[in-house]
């Protein structure tokens, strides 16, 4: 008889790394913060200039441009969160936290800022406040990356080992975007880590159909297939592991 031993796989992915491609730099839409009345066009222009420098990792010039924007409009939410990102890259975590907080205070509906603030908090190991920011952000039904946001929220609850909340948020991510590969993988890993092999199989199969599988996903597939008694399927995944 083949005995099956559950293998634990890490279910955390560095949230900051995942989010880096979705930072506010993409698009760089100007903010509608009400207090940007002194010269909003100039504040927006300096903010976009700062964004361009930040994208090229020219942090001193980004800092200078964003300071100019905030001289004109001290509560310009885009400039505040951009400055937070600059300080985050420089390792000035206290300043980054302060400017992220100012950004979401200035514009409470600024979902991208909350998402980026949550990434920062998660990277600092502050999982509870990160989840709080993501919960607030998740209420924005018009947010373009809402499925990713719910996936991030599920991951945040995983870090807190609040598995029911994590499962609910990951399932919500899939209902919003059925092609969210990362969400399927995280849901499969959650169920697998809890020994729920039957529940892990379907999301794992969805992930394998949508993405190029890595070693951890294939090993999980081998284990679950063995647990299901699907030895030929397990052997197929084992062969893929050998060529991966």
Predicted features, each with a name:
Residues 22-45:
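Bacterial Sec signal peptide processing site at the extreme N-terminus
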Residues 55, 89-90, 123-124, 140, ...:
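Register position in tetratricopeptide repeats
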Residues 37-98, 132:
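Post-signal-peptide N-terminal segment of Sec-exported extracytoplasmic proteins
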Residues 42, 76, 110, 144-146, ...:
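Residue-level recognition of tetratricopeptide repeat
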Residues 38, 72, 105-107, 140-142, ...:
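Structural marker of alpha-solenoid helical repeat scaffolds
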